[in-house]
């Protein structure tokens, strides 16, 4: 019943000529899967992600003209409880509806919990210049709740058992983030949920949510609707899926500046239809926006250059009297209406903007 392979048919894998990007995968040297199951009063009394599931659907692919593909699986009954999982794949969407139905085939009421989790190995996928101190993309878990907002939880924090994130809420989602792509478990309906992050054997990390299913009487069925997103970090689409989901796109500390830059880049691309030209035009617009600052800086530097002989002469004549030298220099600056830092300040103001632009290009 686990999702063990998800291949992005419209995205090529970096460094693999002719190969598609594979997000979920379970094989030698790599583990990245989506799992769900039940937790009962005692171990082994309800189906888990380890329980064998049987495919009930006959359709395996989305037919021409069909908008949705429904794939239904049912677990073997465990302790009189059966878990039926229905995946609904929609054409043109990376968001999959996952309906979880708990059937009580026993003679006594049960009240299990449903868990959904993302499990992957701790291999970091960093993208960015191979230069010390250069920004690198984030790989690891992230949580979101309306109260605590977006919370990154690096693998090393989980190892040290000092990961800080909201442990329970009435809304929110959990994700695994890597460069360009993400996977997310969502429970759209408001309701109590618990969040967890743990280190498993074999350098594996599991992050997920727990939901109460409620009392299920004998012969009754309880349903929990969840969703699984597995795909690229397309910001404009992610924001429509769930609150805060666009935040999985990592802009580092430049977030406030990077967001409007990406918005502008996105709309320029819509006009010209080419990302390369969109980037060129964005840089031209930024240079035009900063033209006044740059002109001011160049004028200030030109004035400082013209004053340089007088300043040098002053330093030579008053080198034994630093205080008077400083006073005379400030007098010259006032008389000539020159700001000694006027050539640097306009440039310094622009630096955060272009760092933010770097993050936009790195993340997009």
In which residue ranges do the predicted regions lie?
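Soluble non-transmembrane domains of integral membrane proteins
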Residues: 1-247
């Amino acid at each position: 019943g686990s999702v063990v392979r998800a291949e992005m048919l419209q995205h090529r894998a970096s460094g693999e000529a002719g190969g598609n990007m594979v997000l979920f995968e379970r094989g030698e040297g790599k583990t990245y899967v989506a799992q769900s199951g039940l937790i009962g009063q005692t171990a082994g009394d309800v189906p888990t992600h380890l329980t064998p599931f049987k495919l009930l659907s006959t359709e395996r692919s989305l037919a021409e003209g069909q908008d949705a593909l429904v794939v239904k699986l049912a677990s073997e009954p465990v302790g009189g409880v059966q878990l039926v999982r229905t995946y609904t794949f929609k054409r043109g969407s990376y968001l999959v509806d996952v309906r979880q139905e708990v059937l009580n085939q026993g003679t006594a009421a049960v009240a299990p919990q449903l868990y959904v989790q993302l499990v992957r190995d701790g291999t970091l996928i960093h993208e960015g210049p191979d230069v010390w101190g250069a920004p690198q993309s984030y790989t690891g878990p992230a949580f979101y709740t309306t109260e605590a907002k977006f919370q990154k939880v690096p693998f090393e924090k989980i190892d040290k058992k000092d990961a800080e994130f909201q442990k329970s809420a009435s809304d929110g989602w959990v994700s695994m983030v890597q460069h360009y792509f993400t996977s997310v478990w969502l429970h759209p309906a408001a309701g109590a949920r618990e969040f967890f992050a743990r280190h498993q054997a074999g350098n594996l990390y599991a992050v997920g949510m727990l939901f109460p299913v409620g009392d299920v009487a004998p012969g009754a069925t309880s349903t929990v609707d969840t969703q699984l997103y597995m795909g690229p970090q397309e910001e404009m689409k992610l924001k429509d899926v769930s609150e805060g989901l666009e935040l999985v796109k990592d802009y580092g500390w430049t977030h406030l500046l990077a967001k409007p830059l990406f918005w502008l880049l996105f709309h320029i691309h819509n006009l010209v239809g080419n990302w390369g030209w969109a980037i060129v035009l964005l840089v031209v617009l930024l240079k035009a926006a900063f033209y006044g600052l740059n002109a001011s800086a160049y004028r200030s530097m030109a004035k400082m250059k013209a004053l340089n002989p007088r300043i040098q002469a002053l330093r030579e004549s008053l080198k034994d009297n630093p205080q008077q030298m400083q006073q005379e220099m400030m007098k010259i600056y006032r008389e000539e209406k020159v700001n000694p830092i006027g050539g640097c300040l306009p440039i310094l103001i622009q630096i955060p903007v272009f760092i933010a632009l770097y993050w936009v290009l790195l993340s997009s």
